[in-house]
Amino acid sequence: MPSLKEVRNRIASVNSTQQITKAMKMVSAAKLRRAQDRAMKIRPYAEKLNGILQNIAASLEDGADNVYAEERELKRLLIVVVTSDRGLAGAFNANIVKAANALIEEKYSNLYQANKVDFICIGKKGAEAITKRGESANLEYQGLFQNLSFDTARGASEYVMNAYLTGKYDRVEVIYNEFKNVATQIIRTEQFLPIKGQALSAVKHSATEVDYIFEPSKEEIVKELIPKSLKVQFYKYLLESNASEHGARMTAMDKATENAKEMLKALKLTYNRSRQAAITKEILEIVGGAEALNN
């Protein structure tokens, strides 16, 4: 049985840890409210923008030039991995890394073995995971979530779009956490570029196509709207991931606080038993000493 001093030290240590996890839970809860609000607000905006884009693009003549929807032979792939800069968020980052590994194994193993797969890591933890594999990310964005805005996210989205336009990459996949609720985050793997044609085809053959009046022309509007829509979509990925991170950290810290509470109960019980055993031992020694004197 451990000594009373050892148990007291462990109780003090666990109590200190509990205070830290409780404080982190409260901080994450405060940040989550703002991050969740921003993620919820951009969803209808992004969906409406994409709906307008699809209706306009579907009404264009077949064969109209759309560089962002151009399907090319897949010679080089870019995977954008969206993680966090900090840990203590449960399996938030580990699940993203697992999803990236699964994506490569299931769809792009030949490209990967031929060293034709590059990574962009948004968040420190993604870059660390790739480094552990003996590789390095082609580009890292750290600290982006400290002051996340459309302007701060624009640099990353424009780099990805330009890399696709110049032919450096033939396809871009994005892996991120979509926010569902505080306790649930859904791993999403989406093809960012080229723009998938299924949605446009569905709109083209649907009866809900909207009859827009264009000024100056459809082609010019689409030319301007597609890049903006892509930037909004990329920004949405980051907002979803940011809200998911705070939700995951809040849940993890809540669980850690509860675990610390249970551990404190067990340690206090151990302390009381050790103290009782020590007192019993002292009483027995006193009684034994008194009997020895009487004899």
Curated annotation (Swiss-Prot):
Transmembrane segments: none annotated. The keyword Flavoprotein does not apply. The keyword Membrane applies. The gene is atpG. One of its GO terms (molecular function) is proton-transporting ATP synthase activity, rotational mechanism. GO terms for biological process: proton motive force-driven plasma membrane ATP synthesis. It comes from Cytophaga hutchinsonii (strain ATCC 33406 / DSM 1761 / CIP 103989 / NBRC 15051 / NCIMB 9469 / D465). It is a peripheral membrane protein. Belongs to the ATPase gamma chain family. Its main location: membrane. NCBIfam families: ATPsyn_F1gamma. Produces ATP from ADP in the presence of a proton gradient across the membrane. The gamma chain is believed to be important in regulating ATPase activity and the flow of protons through the CF(0) complex. GO terms for cellular component: plasma membrane; proton-transporting ATP synthase complex. Keywords: ATP synthesis, Cell inner membrane, Cell membrane, CF(1), Hydrogen ion transport, Ion transport, Membrane, Transport. It is found in: Cell inner membrane. HAMAP family: ATP_synth_gamma_bact. F-type ATPases have 2 components, CF(1) - the catalytic core - and CF(0) - the membrane proton channel. CF(1) has five subunits: alpha(3), beta(3), gamma(1), delta(1), epsilon(1). CF(0) has three main subunits: a, b and c. SUPFAM superfamilies: ATP synthase (F1-ATPase), gamma subunit (SSF52943). Signal peptide: none annotated. This is ATP synthase gamma chain.
